[in-house]
């Protein structure tokens, strides 16, 4: 079901939530302790490499990047790869590049590894970066084997700057969903989609209109997908089985559908690009 022009105009003019309740959320619990060990291991490994290739999600180009890379920028050539460009709304790509350049990042590339978009540009860029470094000579770069790749596990920053940044990272699948809460994540996703007028979920799930109430949306999703469950209810005449929507299952589908790009491309850092800091900054 597609939104008619009138319905789309009505949705765009609707008064959506201006903020998302963030108080009382334990962000530290979302990021497992083993990542601290991973950071130490990565830091020791960095001494062995000639160039750092940092891979980050293009939907959050400004949020959640590891400060470890910032500390090593002056010592090692550095390339930032913003992957999953096919899932990101890159309307503001020029502003993203300008923002990153203001942070000292001049070597940035957007990629889509699934369709091999721009991926083949990485090795030539790395070769050029190493060749430009005063520590290396061009002939050393061209010897066989051309280069060795030292892969490291994905490790987040030891401290997340805000609850909202943590939610963005969670939406991109950086942490296990159950640590944050699937229904909480689904609500934040709905809030974000409506706020930025991305109404692809209405069309995908065949809803009558855009909605800002996550319970109503998940109920419609559950009914459409047949995700229901029997629940026993105690009444004056005994136990009665009733059928009710399986909200957790609907929330999981909502999140997975977003991550596959079926709800349309989204830029989760749009507010940051426009100069608005993430909400509920941690002390």
Describe each PLM feature range.
Residues 2-52, 59-79, 85, 91, ...:
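Helix-rich effector regions associated with P-loop NTPase G domains
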Residues 77-79, 85-140, 245:
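Canonical P-loop GTPase G-domain recognition
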